[in-house]
Curated annotation (Swiss-Prot):
Localization: Cytoplasm
Its biological purpose: Modulates RecA activity.
One Pfam family per UniProt: RecX_HTH1
Name the UniProt record assigns to this protein: Regulatory protein RecX
Chain segments annotated as transmembrane: none
Main localization, broad class: cytoplasm
InterPro entries from the UniProt entry: RecX_HTH_1st, RecX_HTH_2nd, RecX_HTH_3rd, Regulatory_RecX, WH-like_DNA-bd_sf
Top-rank taxon: Bacteria
Protein family: Belongs to the RecX family.
Biological process terms in GO annotation: regulation of DNA repair
GO cellular component, one term: cytoplasm
Keywords: Cytoplasm
Length: 166
């Protein structure tokens, strides 16, 4: 029978927790560190894991070694996921920045992904406002504001109306 959680070494408990977290979905290294340092809900309420900074570093290193934690893979999957939900490149970049991903990694992944952002912006506008897209000024402004909020760049948004005659 396994020993009670409270008697297991902090490193083993941290490693177990990291694997469970990463089994659900990919995380950035910063996200994993934040989740590992957060209190765990136990039978008697929140419990802290008395782990040293070295324990955290060993767990992160183990996750990298065993390919549980890979920021490149995380970035590519995150971009694909958020673009499927209709978000544009500016918003995706900002969210990756909040998750602790470097600007260089983000830009590299954005160049490698084969997403036509202007076509995505057009699809989002049609989904929200219907086809044909509005042509009067005040309605165009509403569409632009919506797409800017979703994270599309002004060039991609303006491309919708440039190709409007097609």
């Amino acid at each position: 029978m396994s020993e009670p959680t409270s008697r297991r070494p902090a490193y083993a408990r941290l490693l177990d927790r990291a694997v469970r977290i990463l089994a659900v979905r990919d995380h950035s290294e910063q996200e994993l560190r934040r989740k590992l340092s957060a209190p765990v809900m136990g039978k008697n309420g929140p419990e802290e894991i008395d782990a040293t900074a070295d324990d955290y570093e060993r767990v992160i290193a183990w996750c990298h070694e065993h390919h549980y934690l890979d920021d490149e893979r995380f970035v590519m999957r995150f971009i694909a996921s958020r673009s499927r939900k209709g978000y544009g490149p500016a918003r995706i970049r900002q969210e990756l920045n909040q998750k602790g991903i470097s600007r260089e990694s983000t830009e590299k992944a954005m160049r490698e992904c084969e997403i036509d952002w202007s076509e995505m912006a057009r699809e989002q506008a049609i989904r929200k406002y219907g086809e044909p897209l509005p042509s009067n000024f005040s309605e165009k402004v509403k569409v632009q504001r919506f797409l800017l909020y979703r994270g599309y760049l002004m060039d991609d948004i303006q491309q919708i109306w440039r190709n409007f005659a097609d």
